[in-house]
Structures are given as structure tokens and as C-alpha cells.
């Protein structure tokens, strides 16, 4: 019986000979709230794994130690927001910093410790097995921060409106049943008068705007309620908070406008479009956002049906204006999580749903796709056909995928979008159906004959 061949016993830290080290000067960092665990290649330091605190001085000391260990590239997981300060400091020292998805770095069960985690990251990065996450340029990151803050403020203002509505309902003031929005001109005027101490329903009804359909008598009847001191106190505070958030939203809009004007332009300054109406909803910026976005991107993305100016703003703040980060439009759609994630085993597709990604741009595209349900454009007709065939959820994803590809082509190649209209789309679809029916008939040794020829 032949003896089994003896295998050479690997020493600690020795790599598998079947893998080729692409990044020999790589370090791995396990990011945490209070401590960061850092691993460097074996032999660079008597203690290749060290722990550093999260204070700024500790982060600078970490960067200096990595320099002393001749490290050139660093990898870390995108853990909450703990990695951001560390990323910026390491980048200022000249390191190539890679931020990876934690789902792509999972190790075996039962081997999850901080020390093993940073060593595992360092090993994976050494062999080039990790993909760096997308991080937009600095000016896009600043814009994204402003827009996310504005979104938080709008959400907080909406919460205040809900609190005011709840308080009115508790006092049986049925104002919301006669006007469509209590945060409009009429609603806010009445609320401010109530907070100021006015209880006469006839006088409160005089604040009715001309565009409100309900009569003054109907509004006066809806304002007959059970005035309670504690609920009026809640109403007053909710109104004050709402005014504060509206003020902060306006300040945020000014900051966004200033930053947009400093961003690189791809077009010559254009003549300003129509001014923003004073009665515009609070979600709409108080400056001409469309012209600024056209100047930055070089194209007018709002020509695409479903893409409103704020949708375009959200997409740009998440993906930027440089489409060269994705080689093809398919890669762009895959990054957004808008394409099938096929799981194949044994020659069979086990799962074909989309990947679960947390991406505000993808969410904005899905909302834009759903807004096409009543659009009289070619995209609207296409979406309604997909909805009847696939159902709403799949149709929304499919149309969001199509919108993403259109945005990619327009921003990368500078092409303008021309909507051919619903009639042109229906005509083209009818021709495709006729061609398919003729092919099916030919396969059965039959022939299609128009109904007019039969009757004649």
C-alpha cells in the first residue's frame, strides 16, 4: 500500500501558494466605536496586530504606525459612520483606502473576534478579493450631506403637521375635512389665529382663501370644537416647531444653492427659467434648481418622463455626474440593485430576484417609475403594459432599470432625450405583435390575412 505523500506544514502567517498576492503592503482594520484593530503583514512589526483608540490623536498615531510598517493600501468595513473620520485621516496621509461591504467579508462561523476580523480583512485585501465601494467626489459628498439634512428637516416638519392634525381631531375640530391641506395658506392662517386666542368660528372662517372650494359657513361649522387648554398648548408648540423647521429648510436651500454654483459646469450659463412660485410646497426648493442641474450635468434629465427636478437632484447627489466609474449601463443598473440577482445551482435558476441594497438613487428611480402610471408618454405606455403583464412590483423595478439606463446614456454621452409619444409607442408595439403572429402562423403552415381583405 502506497504511503500518503507528506505535505509541508505551513507556518503561521504563510499564504496559500495557489493564490497570488496583489497587494503585499496591505493592512486590514476592524472599525469600532471606541477601538480600532489593525493588522499589518507578518514581519513588519513584532506585534502585527495592534489596537488604537477612536480619538483624533489615536487615529494620527495609527497612520504613523502604518507608515512605519511600509503599508500602502488599507481596507476597512463600512461600519455605521465610524469609518468616515478614519477614512479622511488615512487618505490625508497618502494611503489608498478601500471601504468594503461587510457582507462581502464574512468568515467562518465561530471565528468572529476583533483580532481575527482585521487579520481576515488584511488577508483578503492582500489577494485582491475585495471590491472597493463607490464613493463620489468631494463636491458630490458635500451636496449629498446638505440634501440628506434637508430631507430630515422636511420629514420633521411633516411630523409636526401630523401632531397638529391629531390635536385638532382630539378637540373635534374637523378642519381637515373641508380643506385639503392644513399646512396651506388657509389652514395655517386659521391655526395661527387659534393659537393667538381666537375662538369665534365666524371670524376664523374669514381667513378662507379664494381658491378653497368650501364655503365660509362650512368652514365655520368644522371649527366648532371642544377647546381644551392642554391640547391648545400642544398645538402651539407643534406650530412653533413647524415654523422653525420651515425656517431651517429655507436656510438649507440657500446653502445648497451656494454649493451648486461652485460645482464644475458642463454647460455655459443659461437664461433663468420661470421663477419659483411663492405658494410652492415646502418640499420644493426656493431657487431655480433645474437650471443649476442642467449646468452641472450638461443635459436636461427632466425631459425624461417621470424624472422631476428633485428626483434628478437626489440621483446626482448619490451617484455624481461622472459615469466612467461604471464601464457599462448594465454595471450601473447592477450597482443600483435594479437587475436580477440570479442564483444558479445544478443548471437551474434557484432565485432571480433583485439584490437588497440600501440606495437612495434606486428608491428615487422606483418612485419615478410609479409616477408614470398616468403619463401620456412612451415610457408611460410601456410601464402600463409591463404592469398588466408582470404586476406592479416587477413592473416598477423593470421601469426603474430602464430609467437608470437612460440616465447613464444621457450623462455619459451627452445625448438628449426625445419622447416619441404614446401613439408612436403603441404603433411600434402593434407592429411587433403582428410580426410575432406572422411568425407563429408560419411555423404552423398558416398565413395571416387582414380582415379587410376577407370582407372585400
PLM region descriptions:
Residues 1-456:
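A detector of single, family-specific signature residues
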